[in-house]
Amino acid sequence: MHDKIKMDSSWEGRVFPLALIVSFGFMFFYVSLGFLGVIPSLEPGAVIGEASRWCERVSTSMFREPVNALSNLGFMITGLLMFWVLSKDVRSADSNQFHGLTPISMLYAGAAIYLGPGSMLMHGTHTDWGQWADNLSMVMY
């Protein structure tokens, strides 16, 4: 018979809302800076309307590669779904590390979420720091 551990500590109930707030906060911050004209930039050699190194034409909008940038919302949604499912999961005392909110499951879900903003910064800005954020997110995953 498996012993069940009900997750009812106060911090476990806050993990999903915190991940949701951080994700929406990033999007709000990015879009706000985009409307203010702070974020969009161009890498040297890139020409508006020409295909970039990642097969999408470079745009003048706040997202230099709109499809590549916005498709990264899928990673954010997937990571948020992971946090939601994990926060509702009943953990067995002898279960593996991906049942419930364990350090490894939270790290994995957090890395999945960060893949979205990291890649979005690269495809959205075409800057060196955006490329750095993208590389960091892939290494973290």
Regions found by a protein language model. Name each.
Residues H2-Y141:
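Early transmembrane hairpin module of multi-pass membrane proteins
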